[in-house]
């Protein structure tokens, strides 16, 4: 049987959750489908993280729709999978292929009007989409997929000059208002927990450097290649997102059995209460950074299984193409 041909499109400029989702998904799909991907030429980090067996089409940041249309016409795909709204609006509706979009962010009806199907990752988005979106609608949780640990806790503490006995509170994301790193930083300064270190990791950290002058127990790092090393370093994971459509990092922290402090938002409210996670409002006076009785927590994360979730998306493709389940 001829392999289903898929063209993914992600024309972002950085590397965060949406880009990781794409790389993970095409890693899985390359075993079963004929997969290619369209990315911006200048996004070297994304390009370097894409499976080397997958064909990459690189485009420049001008006249993107014209370039993408040419690639699609030449590739003759069965499925075009758009990631983020700027990719979705560059694809015109066609009777020659099906267009599906993953709503990594909040979606706009005008941008997704050409899509045949939409994947969302939480119930709030699903309810919103039922009112506005006319195509096929699917809800699919994200997954966890992490690299093996390559540097142990002792090595990293020494490298980062963290005192051996200090409790490490950590968060991984982006230094963007959405992620709430400013809230974590403010709260940590206010409470000033003894014998502890705050470690915040993500793109855009340079703008925060002036906020941690004279704070030897606060460390900011930029993008890192292996998050597993740092989850393994954390004693407690802290997430203060103002909003998310899901939240990769919270589920990743669960894989490391970390005690977790998190805000509540539309991306996690479907499932967060099923787990032993401390839900907090970072703007209130309640104490958050406790340093005593910190123990590992066992979570059942089977609902976020990588292979199961990717297989689910494969079935979505097949349903759009009218291919019956085996």
Residue ranges and their predicted role:
Residues 8-64, 204:
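N-terminal strand-loop element at the rim of the active site
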Residues 16-24, 167, 171-190:
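A conserved mid-protein helix/loop that constitutes part of the nucleotide-sugar donor-binding site
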Residues 17, 293-326:
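A charged, aromatic-enriched C-terminal amphipathic alpha-helix characteristic of glycosyltransferases
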Residues 39, 259-262:
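Short hydrophobic beta-strand element within catalytic cores of glycosyltransferases
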Residues 43-50, 197-221:
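Short, structured helix-loop element that forms part of the nucleotide-activated donor/catalytic region
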Residues 61-64, 82-88, 103:
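Short His-centered aromatic/hydrophobic patch
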Residues 223, 242:
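Aromatic "clamp/platform" in nucleotide-sugar-dependent glycosyltransferases that forms part
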């Amino acid at each position: 049987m001829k392999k289903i041909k898929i063209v993914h499109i992600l024309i972002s400029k950085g590397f965060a959750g949406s880009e990781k989702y794409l790389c993970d998904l095409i890693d899985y799909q390359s075993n079963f489908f004929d997969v290619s991907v369209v990315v911006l030429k200048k996004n070297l980090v994304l390009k370097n993280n894409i499976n080397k067996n997958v064909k990459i089409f690189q485009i420049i940041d001008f006249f993107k729709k014209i370039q993408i249309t040419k690639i699609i016409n030449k590739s003759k795909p069965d499925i075009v999978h758009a990631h983020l709204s700027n990719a979705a609006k560059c694809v015109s509706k066609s009777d020659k292929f099906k267009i599906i979009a993953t709503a990594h962010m909040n979606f706009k009806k005008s941008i997704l009007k050409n899509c045949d199907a939409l994947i969302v990752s939480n119930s709030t988005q699903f309810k919103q989409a039922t009112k506005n979106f006319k195509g096929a609608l699917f809800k699919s949780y994200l997954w966890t997929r992490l690299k093996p640990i390559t540097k142990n806790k002792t090595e990293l503490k020494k490298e980062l000059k963290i005192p051996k006995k200090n409790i490490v509170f950590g968060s991984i994301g982006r230094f963007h208002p959405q992620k709430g790193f400013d809230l974590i930083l403010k709260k940590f300064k206010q409470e000033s927990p003894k014998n502890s270190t705050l470690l915040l990791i993500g793109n855009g950290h340079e703008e925060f450097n002036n906020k941690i002058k004279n704070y030897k127990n606060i460390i900011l790092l930029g993008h890192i290649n292996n998050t597993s090393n740092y989850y393994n370093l954390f004693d407690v994971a802290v997430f203060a997102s103002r909003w998310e459509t899901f939240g990769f990092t919270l589920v990743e922290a669960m894989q490391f059995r970390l005690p977790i402090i998190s805000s509540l938002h539309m991306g996690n409210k479907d499932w967060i209460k099923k787990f032993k996670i401390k839900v907090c409002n970072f703007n209130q006076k309640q104490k958050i950074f406790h340093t005593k009785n910190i123990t590992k927590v066992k979570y059942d994360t089977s609902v976020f299984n990588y292979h199961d979730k990717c297989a689910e998306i494969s079935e979505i493709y097949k349903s759009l193409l009218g291919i019956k389940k085996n």
